[in-house]
Structures are given as C-alpha cells and as structure tokens.
Amino acid sequence: MMALPAFAAEYGEPDITPQTTMGEIRSNPSILGAGVWTYSKEQNLPGTEDWCNDQTLEKYVSSHVAQDCADGLNLLIRNYNAGVQITYKLYSEQEIAEDSSRNNVEFYYYPASTPDAKYALVLSGNIFNRTAELKECISTAYQLHQKGYAVFVMRYRAYPDNDNNSPMEDIARAVKYITGHAQQFGVQTE
C-alpha cells in the first residue's frame, strides 16, 4: 500500500455531488485554496451562514444545473490540485487602494484540454444588483469546457454599490487581461 504524500491533506477531493451541502463545498480545502466565491451577494449576510451552508448544492443552484455545477466544481478542484492557478485578480493593489470596490473583481480560469483554444468569458447575475457565479456560471463553464473552450468565469462589481460604468469597466478589463495573456492561457485572441 502506498502512502499519501505529506501535502495531500492540503487538497480537497473532487467528490462533490448535487447532494453535497454548501457548507461541505465551502470547507473543501481546494475550493478555499482556489479562492472561488461560492455565495450570491444576498446570501453573504450576517446570520444567514447556517441556512445557506445546510442547503444541498442541488437546492442552492436548482436541480436542472446541479450535476453540471458539481462536475464544474470537481474540475476546478482537479485543476487546482494539479497546480493550475484558478483565481486572477483584475486590478492591482494600487488600483484597489484607490477604489476598494475593485477588490472583488476577478475571474476563475478553466483551462481548455488543448492549446490554442477558443475562450468564453461567462457572466452571471443581472449587473444591476447581484452576481451569482456558482448558481449561474459554474455549470455553463463545465459545459463549455466539455466542448473544448477555455473558460473564464467573471466576478464583477454590481451597480448599487458602484457607479454605472463599473461592470462594463470590469468586463473590458477581463477581456484585455485575457487577450494580453493569451499565450499563458493557451487561447486564441480572435
């Protein structure tokens, strides 16, 4: 019998199913290490943690996308465990110091299986008052990955807490970043 490497305890298992609770997902070491946001804005309010964490993934995201969402999270875990950087901040520390609302602007990277792939930037929510990366993007990211795309799941600023152009600035920043790092991500720029 082979012993596990010493670092194995630092990684989570890619064993998420639609019946896994949100608390179990949020405590998975690889989800934590990857830095993926697993809340919707309205569900990260003080006093709602237990209610949210006790829900199954299926109840949280809905039954029609739960399996693809679980598969997408498991893919993310496998990528993270293999040393792939998942989360990319889109603003520098100086830019965040100038405007703290930029701190949460980031994307989550799902590399394609082959180099020089097309890519998709997946957005969630309604830009006005919420984003919902887990509920609306992870399943889509998985489906697109299965079709050969590199996928970037975007977390952007919503309007109520920011000026009217903030979401558009964030999306433009993401496209510019991906294009500028196309070779690193193994994606086509057109």
Language model features with spans:
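Sec-dependent signal peptide cleavage junction
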Residues: 3-10
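Short beta-strand element of the alpha/beta-hydrolase
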Residues: 117-126
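Serine-hydrolase catalytic-loop signature spanning alpha/beta hydrolases and amidase-signature enzymes
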Residues: 127-130, 151, 177
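Short beta-to-alpha linker loops that shape the active-site pocket of alpha/beta-hydrolase fold enzymes
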Residues: 126, 155-159
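Short amphipathic alpha-helix adjacent to the substrate-entry channel of hydrolases
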Residues: 133-152
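Gly/Ser-rich "nucleophile elbow"/oxyanion-hole loop immediately N-terminal to the catalytic nucleophile
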Residues: 177-190
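Short, structural beta-strand-to-alpha-helix junction motif
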Residues: 10-35
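N-terminal cap/lid segment of alpha/beta-hydrolase-fold proteins
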Residues: 29, 33-115, 162-164, 168
